[in-house]
A protein has these predicted regions:
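Hydrophobic/aromatic-lined pockets within catalytic cores
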Residues: 128-129, 147-151, 177, 196-206
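Conserved non-catalytic scaffold segment of RNase H-like nuclease domains
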Residues: 1-134, 152-185
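Conserved beta-strand -> loop -> alpha-helix junction used to position metal-binding or nucleic-acid-contacting
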Residues: 132-148
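Acidic two-metal-ion nuclease catalytic site recognized across multiple nuclease folds
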Residues: 197-292
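Acidic, divalent-metal-coordinating active-site segment for phosphoryl/phosphodiester hydrolysis
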Residues: 186-199
Length: 292
C-alpha cells in the first residue's frame, strides 16, 4: 500500500491547547505517486470555519483574520480589511472532531503537522475525546533537530526576510524548499506548506530523513531538552534545569517539593511528570555522553 500523509492545522482563539477554541480546521491528504520517487498526489483538501463557542480575542483575530459578530467592527479597523465573521450557522469543532480523527487513521495514514505534538494534536484529541491510534510526524520537531546540520537551499526565491523567525513554518519551508509562501495562518495554506516542507526533507541530500526516522524523531526530546516538551533542559554541566515560569533556571534537584507536587497535578506532558516523580524519589536524569 502506498504511503498516505494527512496534513492537519488549526487556527484558534488562543495558544493553550488545553482550553482554546478552534475557529478554522484544515485537512489535506497526500498519497505517494506510484513509482515516482519524491512525487505526491493531493487526493483531498478541506478547510472549515468553526464556531469556537467563546469570544475570539482581537489578538487572535489579528493572526488569522477570523472574528465573531461582537468583534467585527474592531477587527475591521485593526485589519484594514474585511474579516471572516463566524455566525451561529458555523458548527463547533467537536461536532466532527471524532470523524476527522478516524479519517486520519484510515488506511494506516500518517498525521503530518507543524508543532502538532504540542498543539494541534492535543486539541484534536481533546475534542474527539480519545487519543490518536495512528502515526504522527511533527515537522517542527524534525526541523529543530536537523536544520543546524543540514545544508539549506542555496537560493530562497524572493529573498530571506531578516524578520523571519527561524522556528516558524515560514522559515522551515524556506529552509527546505527554497521558497517563501503567502497566506500564512490560513489553516489550509499552512497545511500544504507543512506537507511541502516534509516532502523536501525526505528528498534532501544530506539530512538523511526517512519516514520511519521522522516517526521516531517525533517522539524524542529535542536536542538539549531533557523531556519531550522542553520544560527541562540540560545545562553546561549536564544537570537538568527547569525552564518556565518563576522557577526558570533552577536545577531540578533544587526545586521545592511543593512545586514538584504542583507539576504533577497540572496538565504537563507524561514524560515531564515521569521525570518529576523520579526526582521526588531522589533519582535525577543523567545526560548521556558520546565517547570520544
Amino acid at each position: 500500500m502506498s504511503v498516505r500523509l494527512v496534513g492537519l492545522d488549526f487556527e484558534t482563539t488562543g495558544q493553550d491547547p488545553a482550553s482554546c477554541g478552534v475557529v478554522q480546521a484544515a485537512y489535506v491528504e497526500w498519497r505517494e505517486a506510484g513509482a515516482m520517487a519524491g512525487a505526491w498526489d493531493e487526493e483531498q483538501a478541506e478547510a472549515v470555519v468553526c464556531n469556537p463557542g467563546e469570544p475570539i480575542p482581537l489578538g487572535s483575530t489579528l493572526v488569522h483574520g477570523i472574528t465573531d459578530s461582537a468583534g467585527a467592527d474592531r477587527a475591521r479597523a485593526a485589519l484594514e480589511r474585511e474579516p471572516t465573521i463566524i455566525t451561529a450557522e458555523h458548527h463547533h469543532f467537536a461536532a466532527f472532531a471524532g470523524q476527522l480523527l478516524g479519517e486520519i487513521e484510515r488506511d494506516d495514514g500518517i498525521l503530518v503537522s507543524y508543532n502538532g505534538a504540542g498543539f494541534d494534536l492535543p486539541i484534536l484529541e481533546r475534542h474527539a475525546r480519545r487519543k490518536l491510534a495512528g502515526r504522527h510526524v511533527d515537522v517542527y520537531r524534525l526541523h529543530k533537530q536537523s536544520s543546524a546540520a543540514a545544508t539549506p537551499c542555496e537560493h530562497v526565491k524572493g529573498g530571506w526576510p531578516a524578520s523571519l523567525f527561524k522556528a516558524s513554518l515560514a522559515a522551515a519551508h524556506a529552509f527546505w524548499t527554497g521558497e517563501l509562501f503567502d497566506g500564512a495562518h490560513d489553516a489550509l495554506v499552512d497545511v500544504r506548506a507543512t506537507l511541502r516542507t516534509f516532502a523536501a526533507m525526505l528528498e534532501h541530500p544530506t539530512a538523511g530523513w526517512t519516514i520511519e526516522a521522522a516517526l521516531r524523531a517525533t517522539t524524542e526530546p529535542l536536542p538539549g531538552d531533557v523531556d519531550f516538551d522542553g520544560k527541562l533542559r540540560w545545562d553546561h554541566e549536564g544537570e537538568a534545569v527547569w525552564t518556565v515560569g518563576k522557577n526558570a533556571g533552577i536545577l531540578l534537584r533544587d526545586l521545592d517539593a511543593g512545586f514538584l507536587r504542583w507539576v504533577l497535578n497540572k496538565d504537563f506532558h507524561p514524560d515531564t511528570k515521569a521525570i518529576i516523580r523520579a526526582a521526588q524519589r531522589g533519582q535525577y536524569p543523567t545526560r548521556k555522553t558520546t565517547p570520544t
